[in-house]
């Protein structure tokens, strides 16, 4: 039965809900709790709610997820709609205020000179304007002429097109108000009575107020004035006492001043109020608009400034102090500065835009009449309640005397009661500074923790060490030092970490235990001690970081220096190789030229020798250019030495002196391009090249047909070469014993070292043919070639001659 009743009971509920939702979505959109959303979105969300109650769990969960996603997506849209609504409300409130409220012909809302955000306190600004301590927001004129008539001034002040001087538009026509009679003055006196809500009304006041209640209310009346003027005036004694004793809100509302409207009087001294205000218009030096002469005056330099420009001037955002100066003239921030010693953000007071003096403030001298809104508790209005200023009365009977027009000679203090500073219209600057300091402290703490964690995590050698992470620096340093001793090449095993570990262990061993005992004994340690320890930790960490950076920079500088040294060594080596190669090319150019100038029939043996000599100039050449001599067998080497011996024996009878004289200058000229260190590598190819060069030089001198045996001692008397031939040396050694000896001779060409030392590899490659008769002749040929081609510069060479070679020479 219960289930059937439930089944019968649910459909009407759901249908009624559905109908109500449909009606609400189509007709009354504002009655829904989701009225701030878009029409389609609100109807869709309202239509989905009955389904959630009817369907099962599965469908509701899916729709719930979709609804949550939808709410996340429309959060920014709701914020934008909220801001749009606030802006529309401000526009409507501005229109209403400009239509119904004014202070002495000025307004309580801005006139749109600046389109930025109005971040000043509007309630404080409104109160100061109603108290006549700050100039109202006058309507600014783009142009002004002193010759304008009254209706032209009225049109300009109301924002209408300026008519011709002799033409008065119908909307600007006015009639002088008639003089008020005695009956007409009584309602004004009754209206200007100060409503006293803290005590009961007297019988006379109640009778007078109840007799003419309609005439006591001015028109138009603001909502605030109507709400505060009707109920307190007609409230009985019992209600007053009850409100004082039971309502806390009532006591707070009674303590605030009440706004009342003065009687409507559009004339001042028989003139329209617009014409009276703007007949002596003055220009604001900041926005360059023309305003009534009743403007704010700066306290320091007595310059005029309109209220709309004044409320735009504010303190700069909180920032670190410049030039090491502390925040001046900020007594309210002394406590904050003491509490935030580590976050030294300051908020300097605004400076005067004219004389750049700090603590910018203004003073205001109101016009000599009162119109519009006033505070009921304003003591300056009490003497005039019985004699209100009429349009026909003189200015002398006004409440405040007009200004004398004389400029103030001295500046006023920022603490003067008549001075309104920029901090007065923005009283939240201290809270903003505190919030900025707190935010900076949080960011600093987060950055410090992040840097500390990054440093400690990077100092571990592996990921396993990160699990042992703790806030104790000494323990972390000890663990990292133990784990990183094997890996000396890692970054954390550098001297920087050792220095940092040493720096962290500067404290005494009992410091940590003392701090731990203090922490257990005092659960809430003093704030100063914790801040001091935190500052010490920060200083210690900064010192550690500075040492680490210094060591890292020194290591980087050392690596750069080593790299530069390696580059310089490589560059010098390349230059040496290039110079050596160039020296070889220049040294053998004349020899190749002399060999190419031979006019003799080509022979196979001669061609082989020539190709071998040409390959010496570039030792890195391809194997097809004559390097196959290195890879020949000892038999082939012996055959080549035999051929060179036969060629040398045919030319033994030639006198070498003319050839030596001819090649002297060429050797001297080629020596000018060589350096003593440019020596080719010792190779046995040098022997064949030298033999071919000596043969080519000997063939050139065969045209003189000199005959006779070669005298080895004759070479020692040459003026250009200071040496003895190898044959003479061998001849001299025959007279001695059969042991081997070293003969120190001086050669005049750097390449002689290679040619002399190249005999040793030949002897090593031909061990079986060292006793053949062809070997001494080849050695003598090489020596002759060396003697003929050596330049002046000499180097000491040692030639080792065995006894077998000397015996073979003796037999020849």
UniProtKB/Swiss-Prot annotation:
Major subcellular location class: cytoplasm
Basic and acidic residues: bias regions: 34-44, 61-97, 172-187, 317-326, 554-582, 732-747
Keyword Cytoplasm: yes
Biased composition (Low complexity): 14-33, 200-211, 387-401, 632-651, 689-701, 748-758
Cellular compartments annotated: Cytoplasm
Region described as Disordered: 1-97, 159-187, 200-232, 244-266, 317-340, 384-412, 507-533, 554-718, 732-777, 791-812
Record keywords, A-Z: Cytoplasm
Record GO cellular component, one term: cytoplasm
Polar residues bias spans: 244-255, 796-812
Function according to Swiss-Prot or TrEMBL: May negatively regulate the snf1 kinase.
Similarity annotation: Belongs to the SIP5 family.
Protein name: Protein sip5
Organism: Aspergillus fumigatus (strain CBS 144.89 / FGSC A1163 / CEA10) (Neosartorya fumigata)
Organism ancestry: Eukaryota, Fungi, Dikarya, Ascomycota, Pezizomycotina
């Amino acid at each position: 039965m219960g289930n059937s009743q439930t089944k019968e009971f649910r459909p009407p509920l759901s249908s009624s809900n559905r109908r109500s939702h449909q009606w609400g979505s189509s007709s009354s959109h504002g009655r829904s709790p989701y009225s701030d959303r878009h029409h389609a979105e609100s109807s869709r969300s309202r239509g989905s709610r009955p389904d959630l109650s009817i369907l099962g769990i599965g469908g509701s969960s899916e729709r719930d997820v979709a609804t949550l996603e939808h709410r996340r997506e429309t959060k920014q849209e709701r914020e934008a709609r909220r801001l749009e609504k606030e802006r529309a409300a401000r526009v409507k409130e501005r229109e209403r205020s400009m239509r119904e409220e004014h202070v002495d012909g000025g307004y309580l809302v801005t006139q749109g000179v600046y389109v930025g955000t109005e971040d000043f306190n509007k309630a404080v600004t409104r109160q100061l304007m109603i108290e006549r301590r700050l100039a109202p927001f006058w309507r600014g004129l783009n142009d002004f002429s002193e010759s304008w008539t009254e209706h032209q001034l009225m049109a300009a002040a109301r924002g209408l097109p300026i008519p011709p001087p002799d033409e008065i538009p119908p909307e600007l026509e006015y009639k002088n108000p008639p003089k008020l009679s005695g009956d007409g003055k009584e309602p004004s006196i009754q209206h200007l009575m100060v409503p006293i809500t803290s005590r009961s009304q007297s019988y006379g006041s109640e009778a007078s107020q109840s007799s003419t209640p309609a005439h006591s209310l001015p028109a138009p009346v603001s909502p605030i004035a109507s709400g505060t003027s009707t109920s307190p005036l007609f409230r009985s004694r019992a209600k007053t006492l009850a409100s004082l004793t039971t309502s806390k809100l009532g006591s707070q509302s009674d303590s605030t001043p009440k706004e009342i409207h003065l009687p409507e009087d559009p004339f001042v001294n028989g003139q329209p109020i617009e014409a009276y205000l703007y007949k002596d218009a003055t220009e604001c030096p900041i926005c360059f608009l023309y305003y009534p002469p009743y403007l704010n005056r700066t306290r320091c330099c007595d310059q005029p400034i309109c209220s709309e420009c004044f409320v735009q001037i504010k303190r700069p955002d909180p920032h670190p102090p410049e030039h090491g100066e502390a925040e001046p003239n900020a007594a309210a921030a002394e406590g904050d500065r003491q509490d935030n010693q580590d976050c030294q953000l300051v908020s300097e007071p605004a400076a005067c835009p004219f004389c750049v003096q700090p603590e910018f403030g203004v003073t205001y001298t109101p016009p000599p009449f009162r119109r519009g809104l006033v505070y009921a508790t304003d003591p300056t209005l009490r003497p005039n309640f019985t004699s209100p200023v009429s349009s026909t009365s003189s200015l002398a009977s006004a409440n405040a005397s007009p200004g004398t027009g004389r400029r103030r000679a001295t500046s006023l203090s920022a603490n003067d009661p008549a001075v309104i500073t920029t901090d007065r219209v923005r009283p939240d600057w201290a809270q903003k500074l505190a919030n900025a300091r707190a935010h900076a402290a949080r960011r600093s703490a987060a950055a410090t923790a992040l840097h500390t964690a990054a440093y400690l995590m990077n100092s571990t050698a592996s990921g396993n060490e990160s699990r042992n992470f703790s806030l104790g620096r000494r323990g972390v340093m000890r663990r990292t030092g133990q784990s990183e001793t094997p890996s000396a090449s890692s970054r954390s095993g550098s001297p920087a970490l050792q220095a940092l570990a040493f720096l962290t262990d500067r404290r005494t061993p009992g410091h940590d235990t003392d701090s731990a005992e203090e922490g257990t004994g005092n659960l809430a340690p003093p704030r100063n001690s914790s801040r001091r320890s935190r500052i010490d930790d920060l200083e210690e960490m900064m010192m550690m970081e500075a040492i680490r950076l210094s060591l890292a920079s020194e290591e980087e500088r050392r690596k750069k220096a080593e790299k530069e040294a390696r580059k310089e060594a490589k560059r010098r080596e390349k230059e040496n190789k290039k110079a050596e190669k160039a020296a070889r090319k220049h040294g053998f150019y004349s020899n190749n030229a002399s060999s190419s100038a031979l006019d003799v029939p080509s022979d196979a043996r001669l061609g082989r020798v020539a190709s071998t000599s040409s390959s010496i100039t570039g030792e890195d050449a391809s194997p097809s250019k004559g390097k196959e001599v290195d890879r020949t067998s000892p038999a082939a080497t012996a055959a080549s030495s035999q051929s060179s011996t036969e060629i040398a024996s045919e030319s033994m009878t030639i006198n070498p002196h003319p050839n030596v004289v001819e090649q002297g200058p060429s050797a001297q000229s080629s020596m000018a391009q060589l350096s003593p260190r440019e020596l080719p590598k010792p190779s046995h190819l040098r022997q064949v090249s030298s033999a071919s060069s000596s043969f080519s030089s000997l063939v050139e001198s065969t045209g003189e047909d000199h005959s006779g045996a070669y005298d080895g001692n004759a070479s020692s008397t040459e003026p250009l070469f200071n040496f003895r031939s190898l044959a003479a040396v061998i001849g001299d050694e025959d007279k001695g014993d059969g042991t081997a000896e070293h003969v120190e001779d001086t050669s005049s060409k750097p390449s002689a070292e290679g040619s002399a030392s190249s005999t040793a590899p030949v002897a090593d490659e031909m061990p079986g043919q060292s006793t053949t008769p062809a070997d001494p002749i080849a050695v003598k040929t090489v020596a002759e070639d060396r003697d003929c081609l050596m330049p002046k510069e000499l180097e000491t060479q040692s030639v080792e001659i065995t006894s077998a070679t000397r015996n073979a020479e003796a037999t020849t």
